[in-house]
Every structure is written in C-alpha cells, then in structure tokens.
C-alpha cells in the first residue's frame, strides 16, 4: 500500500506490506530523494520507537529508507540468512515501484548490524556499503558471554549458597528453558532464574572477596565494567569504582543469565548448544584481559587477601561445556557468521557500555580484517554510552556521511573522535555526539574469534 505522508516537516511516500513469510516491510521515499537507499532490518520498529529521530534525519537529508520488522517467531526461528533474503525481497519491491537506487547502503543495529556485516561479506552484489551499529556475531557473542557467566558461576556461587538462597544448581547459564519465562523478543527473562542470579550478585557484593571475584569474571569474559544505565563511567585507575560498576553491571545482566538472548540463539539450531569452553585455559584469558581491568582485579584481590591464581585455577577446574556440532554447522554458513572479508566498505560503531553485546567483539573482527588485508574497506568508531542501540540521530547521521564520503571519493575521511563529533554536530539534529577514543579500554586480542576452516 502506497500513500503520501508528512512527518516532522518531511514529505515522503510510504509503502507498507507483508512479505511471504509474514514479516512486515516498509518503504519511505522523500520528495527530495537523493537517489540513495538506506536498507535496514529494523526499519518498521525503528520508525516508531525511541530511535525514530535517526530515520527522520535520513529522510530530511534526502535518503530513502526501506526495511522490515523482525518476524514474531524470531525467538524460536532466528536465522540472519533468511532475514537477508527478506531484505532482498524488499529491495526488489523498491526497484519495481520507485526505480533502481543509485546506491544502496545496508544499515542496522544489533542483529541488524550483524546483517550489515554479513551482507558486506557474502551478499554484497546489491549494496555499495554497510554501516553496522552494535553488531553481534552469534557464536562469538555467546562464547564471550559463556566465559564471563561460567566464571561467575564458578567463583560466586558459594555466596548464594551460604546466604541460604538455594543450591548452586539454581544458577543455570546454558540449556535455558522455553517455558515462557523469556520475553517474546528473546531478550530478558522473568522468574526464578534471574532472581537467583540477582541474589547471588547481591550476596557476593557484600564482601571484598565477592567483589574481587565478580571483577575477575568480567575480565575473563572481556566484558566492559560499565554496563548499567544511569551510573557514572568508572575511573579505570580506581579499583573500588570499577568494583562498584561491575556490581551494577552484573545486576543489569541478571535479566539474561548465560548471555543476552541465549535462548534465542540456542533455539535457532533446534536447541543445540553453540558455545563451548572444553578447550579453554582461563589462565590464558586472564593474560589477555584489558590491562586496566587486570590492574584493578589484582588490587581488589590483594585488598581481599585472596590468591588470584588460585581462583583462576578454580575456574579452570570446573566441568566444561561442549558445543553441538549440529549447532556449529548451522552457524557456519553465509549470513550466519562473518570472517572479516567484506567486498564493500564497512563502518562499524559500538558503545563501550553496551550490555547486550560486549565491545570486545569489535577487536576480533578488526583483527580478521587486517589478517585478510582488508583495512582499506573498514573503519571503526566507539561511543561513550551504556545501553544498546541508543545511538543518537547525530551519531547515525555522521556514520552515513562518512560512508557517503568513502563511496564518493574512494577514500575514508578521518574517523578520529573529534572529527566524527564535528561531522555529527554539523548535521543539526539537536542531539548529542559522543564519539570517543578507547584510551585504556583496549584489549590485547579478542578471545573468541570463530573462523572455522
């Protein structure tokens, strides 16, 4: 269905409909269309939620937008390869009704950003560039979450038991139930399991030993110590501030034991396990932790009178988790995994306090990009914020402008934080730009890159 519309002083033609699998789609073409189409997995929801200003800005700047809504059965049938197929159907419809765009930019956040990366690598014949905001990569993210949650289970379960809350078995991290306790989006749970983990975190935080151990688990998982909204960014030189922030962050994560949307990721391959640690030495992961976190953890351990190496051995001594080869075969296909080999330019943004997707994943992909000699096709930028996908209209506009300059000239403009903030501010969206240098947040190497032969 096509209809003219005016929204926030932008006149555009809108088309909405349903794809054969029941997913909704939307197309908006402004009167001043510049010939460029921005395609987004989450356009339908994005135009009506707190991110709507991003899409309003695109229309004001002359970009057409087209995309889908996530399928209502996604929690049980997640398949990014199929989502890409749907986006191609939307592009077919756009071309039939509005003509072929001069350029197509794949754009998306979270699962939509994974799609952006995957499209750039394996389905690039219909796009010219990709912008990926807060991208996950399924096996990578579930392994990173497994490392932190496994360490938490190993190190602080005793506080839960000693406080009389129940047995250690209450603190599950894998093989989670499809019993309705997970929200329909696949993100977040209700009920006994998250409540048990909150009790465990509260009990551990009441002691110097527990605070030190929670910080160690975050370091082993390569998780940011700053994940809770409305909390101050911790001074990386202040161990107690880091411990405070780790506790608040753990409480934020408690709604998704085992890792954000683990049930959805496990359901995708018929409930089979996609993460593992049966071949992991957590002593190696400790050595590879963020240096500031290592320093803070060591000081917290010294203050608590604990033996750090003994606790790492405690983690190493626990029964391990094996992946299902069926699940790994499912995820090791085009569209479902990425290997750092894009065919078109990619700009990747991430917030350092993203609670759903550890920012450390960016380093893993960047390293693969370099291994494959693709540095000229790739740039990254980081944003000083907690939350997830709450990039401002200014930050989004800057990302698109950078991509447009790369496509127009064949050269990347500067992606230094000050320059990105200047581009963002020039967009006059009335929103804040928070691009930042990592400066102390770097990791030596990402632990969980998955690039099967």
From Swiss-Prot:
| Hydrolase among keywords | yes
Pfam families in UniProt: DUF6351
pH dependence comment: Optimum pH is 7.8-8.4.
The temperature profile of activity is:
Optimum temperature is 28-34 degrees Celsius.
For this protein, the activity regulation entry reads: Inhibited by iodoacetate, p-hydroxymercuric benzoate and copper ions.
**PTM comment:** The N-terminus is blocked.
Reaction(s) catalysed by this chain's protein: a phtalamide + H2O = phthalate + a primary amine
Q: By its UniProt entry, which InterPro entries does this protein fall under? A: AB_hydrolase_fold, DUF6351
Mind listing the UniProt keywords for this protein, alphabetically? Hydrolase
Q: How is it used?
A: The broad substrate acceptance, high catalytic activity, and stability at high salt or substrate concentration of the enzyme indicates that it can serve as a gentle method for deprotecting phthalimido and o-phthalyl protected amides in new chemo-enzymatic synthetic routes.
The EC number(s) attached to this protein equal: 3.5.1.79
GO molecular function terms listed in the Swiss-Prot or TrEMBL record = phthalyl amidase activity
Q: What's its job?
A: Catalyzes the removal of the phthalyl group from phthalyl amides generating phthalate and an amine. The enzyme has a broad substrate specificity and hydrolyzes phthalylated amino acids, peptides, beta-lactams, aromatic and aliphatic amines; substitutions allowed on the phthalyl group include 6-F, 6-NH(2), 3-OH, and a nitrogen in the aromatic ring ortho to the carboxy group attached to the amine.
- What quaternary arrangement does the UniProt entry report? Monomer.
Q: What is this protein called?
A: o-phthalyl amidase
């Amino acid at each position: 269905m096509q209809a003219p519309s005016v929204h926030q002083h932008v006149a555009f033609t809108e088309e909405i409909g349903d794809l054969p699998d029941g997913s909704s789609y939307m197309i908006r073409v402004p009167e001043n269309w510049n010939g460029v189409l921005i395609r987004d997995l989450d356009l339908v929801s994005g135009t009506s939620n707190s991110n709507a200003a991003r899409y309003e800005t695109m229309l004001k700047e002359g970009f057409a937008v087209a995309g889908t809504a996530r399928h209502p059965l996604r929690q049980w049938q997640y398949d990014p390869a199929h989502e890409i197929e749907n986006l191609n159907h939307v592009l077919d419809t756009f071309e039939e009704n509005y003509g072929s765009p001069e350029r197509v930019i794949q754009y998306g956040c979270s699962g939509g950003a994974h799609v952006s990366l995957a499209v750039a690598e394996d389905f690039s014949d219909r796009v010219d560039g990709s912008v990926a905001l807060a991208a996950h990569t399924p096996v990578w993210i579930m392994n990173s979450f497994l490392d932190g949650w496994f360490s938490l289970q190993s190190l602080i379960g005793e506080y839960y038991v000693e406080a009389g809350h129940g047995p250690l078995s209450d603190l599950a991290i894998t093989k989670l139930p499809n019993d309705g306790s997970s929200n329909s989006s696949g993100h977040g749970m209700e009920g006994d399991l998250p409540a048990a983990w909150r009790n465990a975190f509260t009990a551990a935080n009441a002691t110097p030993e527990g605070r030190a151990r929670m910080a160690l688990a975050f370091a082993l998982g390569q998780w940011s110590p700053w994940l809770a909204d409305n909390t101050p960014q911790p001074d990386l030189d202040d161990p107690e501030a880091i411990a405070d922030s780790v506790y608040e962050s753990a409480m934020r994560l408690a709604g998704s034991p085992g890792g954000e949307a683990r049930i959805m990721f496990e359901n995708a391959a018929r409930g089979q396990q996609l993460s593992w640690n049966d071949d992991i030495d957590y002593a190696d992961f400790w050595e590879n932790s963020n240096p500031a976190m290592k320093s803070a953890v060591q000081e917290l351990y010294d203050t608590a009178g604990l033996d750090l190496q003994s606790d790492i051995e405690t983690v190493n001594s626990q029964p391990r988790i094996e992946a299902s080869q069926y699940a790994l075969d499912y995820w090791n296909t085009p569209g479902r995994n990425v290997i750092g080999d894009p065919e078109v330019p990619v700009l990747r943004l991430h917030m350092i306090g993203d609670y759903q997707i550890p920012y450390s994943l960016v380093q893993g992909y960047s390293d693969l990009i370099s291994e494959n000699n693709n540095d000229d096709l790739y740039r990254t930028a980081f944003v000083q914020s907690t939350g997830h996908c709450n990039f401002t209209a200014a930050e989004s506009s800057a990302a698109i402008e950078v991509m447009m300059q790369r496509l127009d000239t064949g050269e990347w403009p500067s992606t230094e934080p000050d320059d990105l903030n200047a581009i963002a501010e020039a967009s006059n969206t009335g929103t804040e730009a928070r691009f930042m240098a990592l400066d102390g947040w770097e990791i030596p190497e990402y632990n969980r890159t998955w690039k099967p032969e």
